[in-house]
């Protein structure tokens, strides 16, 4: 609420906000293909209007259209993939069914249609990876995250892009498990490329929200790597990372929004020394930055450790040396994560502050309270990762053909 105190037409803003939340929740609760696709599209509509009417005035129309076109293109490939799945299942069972439970039972047994299933895998992955903003399908994300109102940036980076990863696991990993192992290395490699691309681009940014947006691209690369290795430990870590990233990145966008609200600046080069002026915000930003960088004992460390462990388990299970090389390269990307997070924190909060920021003071309690809650949760899931792992792991272990936790 504090972030929108100066927004025009707040009732309409919050109505769209709730509609957006409903779409994301419906995606996770959908039980058939049509229901899932409707929910997937519902996420798009309120987000478009939130950007169009409450985004940065100079660029919001162009940014909203870019978001619409990219996500609609992804939706088309998903729709084609769903149609092909429905056709294959109807041929196999003799009846048209869109129920995911039935599809999940029938599709893994279609051993005579592996080539077609691989085509479906690629079509669905293309649509879901647009939502995840994986390189090279990420171009919509930096301007949208940077120019959307802070509450929407928090949900876009902390929740909406995660729905793409959730869908990848639900369809590509579970339903299409019979071909997932054949394509796993290429998916993992795309994840590693995304890690490095997003990290390098984040290092080059001066706009505080755009830096965090490219960081989200990099972090989705971690998740895609974990999905790609197709091991219990990797997929468990990837799903856990959705939780840790939602907490950590949501926290960082809240901190960035508070800084922009108090200083009226977005250029981190014009900031500095804000830890003296905004100590609660600085503490919360430190927690979020350390978690994204993979520092113990925070949630980001626990989830990243599991994801990288999954890469080595893939090598142990398959004897495929490229998995070993890819895992080592993936681990080295932590250097980039630490670098851009260190640059973010030191440039904004440490050192002397410019004279024109002399009158800056701490953000309102309506902002600092929400930051504190997310910071505490980030610490709790880091110290007690079993809170998430013990829920996720048993569900991952039943995926057909997945490589075991060794």
Please place each PLM-identified region on the residue numbering.
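Hydrophobic transmembrane alpha-helices and their helix-loop junctions in integral membrane proteins
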Residues: 1-7, 11, 20-36, 46-347
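Central hydrophobic cores of alpha-helical transmembrane segments
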Residues: 16-17
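Short phosphate-coordinating micro-motif centered on Lys-Gly-acidic
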Residues: 41
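Cytoplasmic/organellar membrane-interface segments at the starts of transmembrane helices
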Residues: 148, 275-281, 341-406
């Amino acid at each position: 609420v504090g972030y929108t105190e100066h927004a025009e037409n707040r009732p309409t803003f919050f109505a769209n906000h709730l509609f957006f939340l409903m779409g994301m929740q419906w995606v996770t609760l959908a039980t058939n293909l049509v229901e899932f696709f409707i929910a997937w599209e519902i996420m798009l509509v309120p987000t478009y209007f939130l950007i169009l009417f409450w985004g940065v005035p100079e660029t919001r129309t162009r940014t909203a259209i870019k978001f619409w076109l990219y996500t609609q293109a992804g939706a088309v490939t998903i729709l084609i993939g769903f149609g092909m799945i429905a056709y294959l299942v109807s041929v196999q069972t003799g009846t048209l069914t869109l129920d995911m439970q039935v599809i999940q039972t029938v599709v893994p047994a279609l051993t005579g249609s592996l080539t077609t299933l691989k085509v479906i895998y690629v079509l669905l992955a293309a649509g879901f990876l647009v939502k995840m903003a994986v390189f090279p399908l990420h171009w919509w994300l930096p301007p949208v995250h940077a120019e959307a109102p802070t509450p929407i940036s928090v949900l876009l980076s902390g929740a909406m892009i995660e729905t793409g990863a959730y869908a990848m696991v639900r369809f590509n990993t579970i339903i299409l498990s019979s071909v997932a192992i054949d394509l796993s290395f290429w998916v993992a490699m795309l994840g590693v490329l995304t890690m490095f691309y997003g990290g390098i681009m984040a290092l080059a940014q001066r706009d505080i929200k755009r830096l965090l947006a490219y960081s989200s691209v990099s972090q989705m690369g971690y998740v895609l790597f974990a999905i790609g290795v197709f091991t219990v430990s990797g997929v468990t870590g990837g799903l856990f990372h959705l939780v840790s990233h939602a907490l950590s990145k949501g926290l960082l966008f809240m901190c960035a929004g508070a800084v922009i609200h108090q200083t009226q600046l977005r250029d981190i080069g014009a900031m500095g020394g804000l830890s003296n002026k905004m100590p609660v915000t600085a503490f919360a930003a430190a927690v979020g930055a350390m978690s994204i960088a993979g520092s113990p004992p925070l949630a980001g460390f626990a989830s990243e450790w599991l994801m990288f462990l999954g890469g080595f388990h893939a090598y142990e299970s398959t004897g495929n040396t490229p998995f070993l090389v890819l895992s080592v390269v993936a681990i080295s990307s932590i250097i980039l994560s630490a670098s851009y997070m260190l640059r973010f924190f030191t440039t904004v909060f440490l050192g002397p502050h410019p004279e024109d920021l002399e009158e800056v003071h701490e953000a309102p309690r309506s902002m600092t309270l929400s930051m504190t809650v997310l910071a505490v949760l980030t610490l709790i899931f880091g110290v007690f990762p079993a809170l998430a792992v013990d829920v996720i792991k048993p569900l991952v272990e039943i995926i057909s053909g997945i490589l075991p936790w060794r």
